[in-house]
């Protein structure tokens, strides 16, 4: 339906996720360490904070999705205005999380919990309309695939703090391997300013197709929608995979802070690791759509997850003290899950389409909110890092190195859990029903279904 997306449209959509990820990656990588090492909060309490935030998300996300779905389109569209409405508050809330006022442990614990939950709520206000925006920009499968790749690229650029922060903020302590809280706060202020500027450009360069907005402008009954979702094997399995893939990414990022700082004693290598981990994505980008047309999304994921599972198993069993062997194996882990990282949002679109196909209703905002909630549950799963690190006896006040027992525990924590999560993803993708053949059938029948609905509304 309608004209093709322009390069400007793709760029506008891409950079919005860059802005989102500028703060998001810092939360996933450094918040646990900030809480334990700067604020002095125990690992168990940090994990509890993350889980409380996710419990609130279980209530907040579906409600937000239904509210967005009910919103009537204005002159600037249905979803685009949220980029500005929520973008600036999101940037400010990210800074507030890393603002330390006193040395009082109780106050700091309550404050960081409150600001983190606030950040999560505003992130939902941003992410649900932003994700839904892709579904009303185009209904063409190849363009949706391109938007998903574009979003992955944008998210990758948003990980720039992971490249620079080890150099900027990991400079404290006698050995220069500890986090500096003041530097982290200043760096977050710079990040927030960049986010605001990017949101302005993104809003200006994106567009919505009125006919697709019309299809999505249906009355929402959240209870019946959730019942439909629970009965939909495609939606359930892909939502779980979406949550697990972000759990793996964030878990590894968070665990690597301890692994590189304590086990390998080379904090700066986290930047090298990040570059190596994104190489598979860079290699795949030009070929993603060709791969989909030839083999299908599910089929590619089955092979990819198998590669990742083997590489992560070797990494765990090998207990490698050579950091380069660990990084090389990480390349293959990321190679295997790279396709789903690139195409996760296109596959989200597929399961929204599947819901429309089987129910006759198109409720992308509510559907997307549920999918986003599962990804937030993935974040919560990744939040067990400080709990596990504390359980193995990690001492943040240790003079010099941790004990060998703790160091071995850090390595196991960093490699065993990702292996188990990847195996679980492999099982789920085998259960996912949308094969290449089934997806093609769905799109053909949906096209007829939509044309009939639009004709009946004229």
Tell what function each PLM region has:
Residues 2-458:
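Membrane-embedded alpha-helical bundles of multi-pass transporters/translocases
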């Amino acid at each position: 339906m309608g004209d093709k997306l322009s390069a400007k449209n793709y760029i506008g959509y891409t950079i919005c996720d860059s802005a989102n990820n500028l703060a998001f990656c810092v939360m996933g990588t450094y918040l646990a360490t900030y809480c334990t090492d700067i604020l002095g909060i125990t690992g168990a309490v940090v994990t509890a904070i993350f889980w409380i935030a996710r419990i609130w998300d279980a209530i907040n996300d579906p409600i937000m999705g239904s509210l967005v779905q009910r919103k009537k389109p204005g002159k600037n569209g249905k979803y685009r205005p949220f980029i500005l409405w929520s973008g600036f508050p999101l940037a400010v809330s990210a800074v507030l999380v890393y603002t330390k006022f006193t040395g009082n442990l109780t106050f700091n614990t309550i404050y960081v919990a409150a600001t983190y939950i606030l950040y999560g709520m505003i992130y939902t206000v941003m992410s649900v309309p932003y994700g839904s925006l892709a579904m009303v920009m185009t209904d063409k499968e190849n363009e949706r695939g391109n938007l998903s790749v574009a979003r992955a690229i944008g998210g990758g650029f948003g990980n720039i703090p992971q490249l620079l922060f080890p150099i900027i903020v990991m400079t404290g302590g006698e050995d220069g391997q500890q986090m500096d809280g003041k530097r982290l706060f200043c760096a977050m202020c710079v990040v927030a300013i960049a986010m605001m500027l990017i949101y302005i450009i993104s809003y200006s360069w994106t567009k919505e197709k009125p006919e697709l907005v019309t299809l999505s402008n249906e009355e929402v009954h959240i209870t019946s929608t959730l019942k439909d979702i629970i009965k939909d094997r495609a939606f359930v399995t892909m939502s779980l995979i979406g949550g697990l893939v972000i759990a793996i990414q964030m878990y590894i990022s968070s665990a690597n802070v301890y692994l590189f700082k304590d086990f390998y004693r080379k904090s700066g290598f986290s930047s090298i690791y990040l570059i190596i981990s994104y190489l598979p994505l860079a290699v795949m980008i030009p070929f993603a759509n060709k791969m989909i047309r030839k083999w299908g999304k599910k089929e590619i994921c089955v092979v990819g997850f198998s590669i990742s599972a083997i590489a992560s198993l070797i990494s765990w069993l090998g207990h490698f003290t050579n950091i380069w062997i660990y990084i090389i194996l990480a390349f293959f882990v990321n190679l295997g899950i790279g396709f789903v990282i690139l195409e996760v949002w296109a596959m989200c679109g597929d399961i929204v389409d599947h819901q429309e196909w089987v129910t006759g209703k198109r409720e992308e905002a509510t559907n997307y909110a549920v999918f986003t909630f599962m990804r937030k549950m993935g974040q919560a799963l990744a939040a067990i890092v400080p709990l596990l690190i504390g359980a193995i006896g990690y001492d943040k006040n240790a003079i010099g190195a941790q004990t060998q027992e703790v160091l071995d525990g850090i390595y196991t924590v960093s490699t065993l859990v990702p292996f188990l999560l990847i195996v679980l993803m492999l099982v789920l993708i085998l259960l996912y029903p949308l094969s290449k053949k089934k997806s093609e059938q769905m799109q053909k029948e949906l096209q007829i279904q939509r044309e009939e609905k639009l004709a009946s509304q004229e």
